Curated annotation (Swiss-Prot):
Positions with biased composition (Basic and acidic residues): 1-22
Name of encoding gene: rps25
Positions in coiled-coil regions: none
Subcellular location: Cytoplasm
Single annotated GO MF: structural constituent of ribosome
Chief localization: cytoplasm
Function text: Component of the small ribosomal subunit. The ribosome is a large ribonucleoprotein complex responsible for the synthesis of proteins in the cell.
Record-given protein name: Small ribosomal subunit protein eS25
Keyword annotations of the record: Cytoplasm, Ribonucleoprotein, Ribosomal protein
Region of interest (Disordered), ranges: 1-37
Length: 124
């Protein structure tokens, strides 16, 4: 192996600035690259009810613990405006119960009284 001290003696006279003539003024910082971001799939929700979805609305939705237009829209794959109208219809028929009504958010829950009345009909 050759001795290393010969190289060290040559470099010892030079300062750090002399070694890097490019970085005298600090150099240019690397540009930040933009992230690609997340791509969402386009929702293809129904604008009007078909027979199967309408039946599903009457069977399943009154059994949900938390019923909001967003929950109904996501589970039944229907538009939000259609979900709001459907929940108004269910409320009118007494299948669900209003918990809180706000300008932007309406919250319903299952009607406990309605299920008690419906249970004896199944037994008979």
């Amino acid at each position: 192996m050759p001795p290393k001290d010969s190289k060290q003696k040559k470099d010892a006279g030079k300062s750090k600035k002399d070694k890097d003539p490019v970085n005298k003024s600090g150099g240019k910082a690397k540009k930040k690259k933009w992230s690609k971001g997340k791509v969402r799939d386009k929702l293809n929700n129904l604008v009007l009810f078909d027979k199967a979805t309408y039946d599903k609305l009457y069977k399943e939705v009154p059994n949900y613990k938390l019923i909001t237009p967003a929950v109904v829209s996501e589970r039944l794959k229907i538009r939000g405006s259609l979900a709001r109208a459907a929940l108004q219809e269910l409320l009118g028929k007494g299948l669900i119960k209003l918990v809180s009504k706000h300008r932007a958010q309406v919250i319903y829950t299952r009607n406990t009284k309605g299920t008690d009345e419906a249970a004896p009909e199944k037994e008979a």
